[in-house]
């Protein structure tokens, strides 16, 4: 809890620095709004119901894409990590595709899925899939073989071996991939919404920019940061619950 005592102070310091930059820099507040104007902007968008609706729309797209990517990434990661011969053939292809930005696939995504919320979901899936896949494969390949030998000596077979021995042993490695995937998926969700959606926080940024409402533009930007922080915090809570349930010390 001690680390949270610094949070109010850090936000107050950021507020003051922001205010000083605007005042001393002589910026036009219509172009670079003060913190107070942004605070009023929060009130305006909350009062209109726009902010919460866009947050909800973004979260729906995010969770659909993220959950599908986690399930697929862990599933294929377990298989490819367990069968190293198959992974040796798949790995070069993965290493070529993995560095490509999900946005680069957008013309083909639109071609196959059309315009709307589906392209954003597909972009989220691509962004989150590879961190989860690679962390799962790495965790499986680095599992201590003693765990498997002892389990087999006690007569433990599949699927009990998977759920009681393998998954608890590799979960810390998978968890790191889940955190990386969360961040990249949230970033690219906003990018996807900027291109093809008519709702969501990414669309809100484009809409406010086109309407020259930089105060509301800043509201959307800050909201993306705060929601991303809450999502990461939520994943951490789930992670701790799983650690506790499986009796894993972190």
Regions found by a protein language model. Name each.
Residues 24-67:
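Periplasmic/extracellular loop-to-transmembrane helix junction in inner-membrane transport proteins
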Residues 53-61, 111-132, 175, 216-221:
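Loop-to-helix entry region at the N-terminal start of transmembrane alpha-helices
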Residues 72, 76, 97-102, 123-137, ...:
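Faces of alpha-helical transmembrane segments in polytopic inner-membrane proteins
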Residues 75-110, 134-143, 149:
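Cytoplasmic-entry segments and transmembrane alpha-helices of multi-pass inner-membrane transporters
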Residues 84, 176, 218-250:
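C-terminal transmembrane helix and the adjacent membrane-cytosol boundary/short C-terminal tail
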Residues 110-111, 187-224, 243, 248-250:
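Glycine-rich helix-loop "coupling/hinge" segments at transmembrane-helix boundaries
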Residues 122, 126, 158-191:
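Transmembrane alpha-helices
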Residues 139-175, 205:
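Short cytoplasmic-facing helical segments at TM-TM junctions of multi-pass membrane proteins
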């Amino acid at each position: 809890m001690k680390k949270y005592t610094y949070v109010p102070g850090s936000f107050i310091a950021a507020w003051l620095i922001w205010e000083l930059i605007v005042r001393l820099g002589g910026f036009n507040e219509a172009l670079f709004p003060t913190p107070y104007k942004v605070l009023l902007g929060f009130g305006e968008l909350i009062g209109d119901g726009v902010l919460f609706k866009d947050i909800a729309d973004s979260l729906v797209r995010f969770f659909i894409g993220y959950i599908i990517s986690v399930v697929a990434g862990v599933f294929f990661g377990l298989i490819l990590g367990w069968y190293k011969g198959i992974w040796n053939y798949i790995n070069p292809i993965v290493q070529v595709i993995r560095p490509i930005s999900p946005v680069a696939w957008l013309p083909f995504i639109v071609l196959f899925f059309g315009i709307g919320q589906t392209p954003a979901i597909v972009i989220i899936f691509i962004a989150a899939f590879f961190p989860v896949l690679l962390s799962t494969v790495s965790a499986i390949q680095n599992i201590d073989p003693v765990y498997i030998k002892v389990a087999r000596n006690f007569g433990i077979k599949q699927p009990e071996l998977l759920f009681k021995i393998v998954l608890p042993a590799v979960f810390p490695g998978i968890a790191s991939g889940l955190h990386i995937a969360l961040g990249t998926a949230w970033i690219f969700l906003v990018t996807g919404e900027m291109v093809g959606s008519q709702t969501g926080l990414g669309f809100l940024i484009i809409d406010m920019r086109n309407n020259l409402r930089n105060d509301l533009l800043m509201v959307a930007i800050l909201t993306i940061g705060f929601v991303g922080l809450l999502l990461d915090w939520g994943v951490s809570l789930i992670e701790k619950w799983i650690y506790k349930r499986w009796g894993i010390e972190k």
